[in-house]
Curated annotation (Swiss-Prot):
Stated family: Belongs to the universal ribosomal protein uL13 family.
GO molecular function: mRNA binding; structural constituent of ribosome
Protein name from the UniProt record: Large ribosomal subunit protein uL13
GO terms under cellular component: cytosolic large ribosomal subunit
Source taxonomy: Bacteria, Pseudomonadati, Pseudomonadota, Gammaproteobacteria, Alteromonadales
């Protein structure tokens, strides 16, 4: 018996919508990363993008535990000497709420072209509205 290998043209991708209200950041991100990779499907193949599309709403209401709201730092470098910028969770969630969840999920996906293709299937919105009603997404309770 030969090992099954999924072919990119035969992969069935579904659309799911996830409400991030009061969900813990890391637990939510790990479940989203698992679904973007397709590891929840029996036809999962490591070198083929078998994952689903995920729409995340209410990203501004995601929760962190303990003192992480004040202590968790995010870093960015401009490439110039002395160009390291840092901001904490509270400031980033107030300024760019989508970026918090995007950075968490992106770090859990494979690095390289396949990981970037998986990441493009995630759509994050700060509020409750999204523009993907035509895809008829199913509600995914995490």
């Amino acid at each position: 018996m030969k090992t099954f290998v999924a072919k990119p043209e035969t992969v069935q991708r579904d659309w799911y919508v996830v409400d991030a209200t009061d969900k813990t950041l890391g637990r939510l991100a790990s479940e989203i990363a698992l679904r973007l990779r397709g590891k929840h499907k029996p036809e999962y193949t490591p070198h083929v993008d078998t994952g689903d599309y995920i729409i995340v709403i209410n990203a501004e209401k995601v929760a962190v535990t303990g003192r992480k709201a004040q202590d968790k730092m995010y870093y960015a470098h401009s490439g110039y000497p002395g160009g390291l910028k840092e901001t904490n969770f509270e400031k980033l969630i107030a300024h760019k709420p989508e970026m918090v969840l995007e950075k968490a999920v992106k770090g859990m996906l494979p690095k390289g072209p396949l990981g970037r293709a998986m990441f493009r299937k995630m759509k994050v919105y700060a509020g409750a509205e999204h523009s993907h009603a035509a895809q008829q997404p199913q509600v995914l309770d995490i």
